[in-house]
């Protein structure tokens, strides 16, 4: 199992690098990430959240775990909805975030094969949230400065726990 990196850890702000090796090492890392995600009752976990600055994440929105490697968002529906989101890198913080209701995506599986699919609702939301992590974008970047100010003390408390 991995230790979750929390707000204040520099790896969360980096743009992750593409995966180039689809080997047993990657599969083992993904298995460990899935185990970690379930242990913390998450529905998604991006590689940067466990200290790996590479472009992949795992998610499970009810149909079993999926590994998403080198993802792209091909189309974003202009229709959006606002819903509450949490994040394992922000313990006990939940914020309302506006995201597209439907997206068309492309990614690679653990064998390096390309997968293209359309996601909507909760699956689209989780994909967008995890995709943000690969670009160094965090949930607090998606809220207003006023709301971020209200969370300032909690954020500072979380950042103090980061091992430097």
From Swiss-Prot:
Known function: Removes the formyl group from the N-terminal Met of newly synthesized proteins. Requires at least a dipeptide for an efficient rate of reaction. N-terminal L-methionine is a prerequisite for activity but the enzyme has broad specificity at other positions.
Required cofactor names: Fe(2+)
Record text on cofactor binding: Binds 1 Fe(2+) ion.
Keyword Iron part of the UniProt annotation: yes
A GO MF term: peptide deformylase activity
Lineage: Bacteria, Thermotogati, Thermotogota, Thermotogae, Thermotogales
UniProt entry keywords in alphabetical sequence: Hydrolase, Iron, Metal-binding, Protein biosynthesis
An example Gene Ontology biological process: translation
InterPro entries: Peptide_deformylase, Peptide_deformylase_sf
Recorded catalytic activity of this chain's protein: N-terminal N-formyl-L-methionyl-[peptide] + H2O = N-terminal L-methionyl-[peptide] + formate
EC number: 3.5.1.88
Residues holding Fe cation: 87, 129, 133
CDD domains registered for this protein in UniProt: Pep_deformylase (cd00487)
Family: Belongs to the polypeptide deformylase family.
Enzyme class: hydrolase
Protein name, as recorded: Peptide deformylase
Metal-binding is among the record's keywords: yes
Active site: 130
């Amino acid at each position: 199992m991995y230790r979750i990196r929390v707000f204040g850890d520099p790896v969360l702000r980096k743009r992750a690098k593409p995966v180039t090796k689809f080997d047993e090492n990657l599969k083992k890392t993904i298995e460990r990430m899935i185990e970690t995600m379930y242990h913390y009752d998450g529905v998604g976990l991006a590689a940067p959240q466990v200290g790996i600055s590479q472009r992949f994440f795992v998610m499970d929105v009810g149909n079993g775990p999926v590994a998403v490697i080198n993802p792209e968002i091909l189309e974003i529906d202009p229709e959006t909805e606002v819903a509450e989101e949490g994040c394992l890198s922000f313990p006990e913080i939940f914020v309302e975030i506006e995201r597209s209701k439907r997206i068309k995506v492309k990614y690679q599986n653990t064998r390096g094969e390309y997968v293209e699919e359309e996601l909507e609702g909760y699956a689209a939301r989780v994909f967008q949230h995890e995709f943000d992590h690969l670009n160094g974008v965090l949930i607090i970047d998606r809220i207003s400065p006023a709301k971020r100010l209200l969370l300032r003390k909690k954020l500072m408390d979380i950042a103090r726990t980061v091992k430097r």
